[in-house]
Amino acid sequence: TEFPEVAHAMLYAGVKKLTDFQDPAYAGEYLTRMAALLAADRDNGGEAKGFAFTVAAAKYVAVAMAYDDVVRVADLKVRGTRFERVHNEVGVKDGQILYMTEYMHPRMDEVCGTLPKGLGLWIEARPKLFAFLDRRVNKGRRVKTGTLFWFSSLYFLSAMRRIRRGSLRHFREVEHREAWLHQALSVLPANYDLAVEVIATRRLVKGYSDTHARGLSKFDRVLSAVPMLQPREDGADWLRRLRQAALIDESGIALDGALKTVATL
């Protein structure tokens, strides 16, 4: 597929990001998905709009595909470039040894996410077993990543990227991503600008653990207003305001107020 020049920079960044996150084949999946989104964009007057839908999707589909999970966090913590950067920032001199202490607080739902889909679902379907395991896992730990034991442990976790596609977390990420893209595509023929904002709303989902859960909740709440906004010419502006309200207030009070306003339009 020949992508419009305006999307090239974002697509290049997306391919680079996803190759680093997983592998070249995963970046290929991204380009295949983007080709389908570009076709929908063309069919709905995207050229006259500067292919804004494709450009936004090039950025946020890559962000969605490169989600933060246990494997990603472990991978980033054992990279040589990270140790080199910290050494330079701290100013370690020749002959000195630097040990880094990381705070980690894993939860059982994150552990289940790294497991094969079937096993993860099997554990989640047994509340007593899940709670038993969570009591043993859900603890704050200060980890010295420069020691052989912890470096090896994190290195092993980072190597699980090879089986990431079969994990429960990956299954759920794909499911959520496709639901989001389906919503954007369903809006596209009727309200192009609103569809672009649906894509851009993905910026609310970021981070890891509790941060990710809060972002996901805000994302779902903001997009719940799309059916009300779709018939409106200013629907895109209102969705943008909802997203900004979600970004500026961690407590969600501003978003609650904005959603109530939209409901009265």
State where each predicted segment sits:
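Active-site loops and adjacent core secondary-structure elements that bind or stabilize anionic groups
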Residues: 1-265
